[in-house]
């Protein structure tokens, strides 16, 4: 067992206690962050005269060797060590001798792991944001090509009003755009360096915390050492943002699953993103979308788990906080994987434009426009609403859309109707009349696409 404590103990740690307490199986993810943090720390120690330049160079050379060997697979991280910090320090001492024993001067594992986690999450926020960008690009590509692809818009999963595929996709662009903005907010808010906070009360060494923060790309040091070692707000914020990403993906997945069904046939998922059945030869299943929908729960669980872990912890560091890793790591991996797969599925998906338009025509999505026609001819809206309701009932009985109802039938219910009712309730007219900002008409949607393109250029 390699651990960083033991001098005041008279007995060996029980093996079950050691295994229960150890974190090497999961915090080994931090090996690169831990080593880079140590390099910055010893550079600062030398600047402050706490270490000699020769000691600094010896330690940094040793740390770089460990980093290179782990990356190449030459050096394996094993459960011989309690955690990633003891792994790095023990291997450093083996390589450079007594100089390695000075690495931990002016530092505690409390501020060390707080730094490692911040460096790691900072990297993951940037990686997540890159994957969000891929989603936005895939969505924008669909929008550009479908400004006049008509389809039904839904409320209560029932056909409501005609829109375009571009308009529908634009709603998802807005969702993932907000996800991108959240990544920027999280990065900005978390970008302070806890190193130098010590166990909780700083250190008596003359550390230059601002210098260390600058070396590691932070905006500056944390301003309270107790908060520095015990803050996990940024991780909770990140998990909350991941949960919202997964919620957006899950909603999108649900629609893809529905649209892909034989009952809708709005889309066909590419073979590369579909699976089959072990017994039913005809099946082509939307398993990727279903799994994304299913995996959303485990990301929610990570957020809830960390909130519950942190809710009763007194200042400053407590061992409970070791539980801030496994579930969040899983949530991060899950969300990134889902984003990557979903973007690929979108890029290869076939949209059945004719089927969408036909569905819009046969769902009375133009009923509101028929009522508006009457209003424009002087009929009070409430009366117009009732008149069109009668027309819908008549069409249901005849099993035809409003577009196919003869004019004489219109006139039987209201003499206000004239031949121009058919133009007024055509899909093209219904959509194009909706030309305010954010509506599905070609003009506002082209403006939206142009705006989104500019947004992506500045991403």
Locate predicted features.
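A generic structural-conservation signal
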Residues: 54-55, 152, 222, 383, ...
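Short runs of predominantly hydrophobic/aromatic residues within well-ordered alpha helices
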Residues: 38, 85, 89, 235-238, ...
């Amino acid at each position: 067992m390699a651990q960083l404590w033991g001098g005041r103990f008279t007995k060996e740690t029980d093996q079950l206690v050691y295994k229960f307490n150890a974190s090497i199986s999961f915090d080994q993810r931090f090996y690169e962050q831990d080593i880079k943090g140590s390099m910055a720390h010893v550079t600062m120690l030398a600047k402050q005269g706490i270490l000699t330049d020769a000691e600094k160079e010896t330690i940094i050379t040793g740390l770089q060797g460990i980093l290179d060997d782990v990356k190449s697979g030459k050096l394996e991280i094993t459960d011989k060590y309690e955690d990633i910090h003891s792994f790095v320090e023990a291997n450093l001492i083996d390589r450079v001798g007594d100089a390695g024993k000075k690495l931990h001067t002016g530092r505690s594992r409390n501020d060390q792991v707080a730094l490692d986690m911040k460096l790691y999450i900072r990297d993951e926020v940037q990686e997540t944001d890159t994957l969000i960008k891929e989603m936005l690009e895939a969505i924008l590509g669909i929008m550009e090509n479908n400004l006049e692809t008509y389809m039904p818009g839904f409320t209560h999963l029932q056909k409501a009003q005609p829109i375009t595929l571009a308009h529908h996709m634009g709603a998802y662009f807005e969702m993932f755009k907000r996800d991108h903005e959240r990544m920027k907010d999280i990065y900005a808010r978390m970008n302070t360096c806890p190193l130098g906070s010590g166990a909780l009360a700083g250190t008596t060494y003359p550390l230059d915390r601002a210098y260390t923060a600058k070396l590691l790309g932070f905006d500056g040091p944390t301003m309270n050492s107790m908060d520095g070692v015990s803050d996990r707000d940024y991780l909770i914020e990140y998990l909350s943002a991941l949960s919202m990403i997964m919620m957006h993906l899950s909603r999108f997945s649900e629609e893809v699953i529905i649209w892909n069904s034989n009952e809708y046939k709005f889309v066909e998922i590419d073979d590369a993103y579909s699976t089959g059945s072990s017994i039913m030869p005809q099946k082509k299943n939307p398993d990727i979308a279903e799994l994304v929908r299913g995996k959303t729960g485990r990301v929610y669980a990570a957020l809830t788990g960390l909130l519950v872990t942190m809710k009763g912890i007194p200042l400053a560091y407590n061992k409970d906080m070791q539980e801030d890793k496994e579930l969040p790591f899983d949530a991060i991996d899950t969300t990134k994987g889902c984003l990557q797969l979903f973007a690929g599925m979108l890029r290869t998906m076939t949209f059945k434009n004719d089927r969408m338009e036909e569905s819009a025509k046969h769902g009375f999505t133009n009923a509101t426009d028929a009522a508006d026609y009457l209003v424009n001819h002087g009929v009070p809206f409430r009366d117009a609403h009732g008149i069109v309701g009668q027309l819908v009932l008549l069409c249901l009985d005849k099993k035809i859309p409003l577009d196919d109802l003869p004019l004489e039938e219109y006139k039987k219910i209201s003499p206000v109707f004239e031949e121009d009712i058919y133009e007024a309730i055509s899909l093209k007219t219904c959509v194009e009349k909706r030309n305010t900002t954010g509506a599905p008409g070609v003009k506002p949607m082209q403006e939206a696409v142009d705006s989104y393109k500019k947004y992506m250029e500045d991403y």
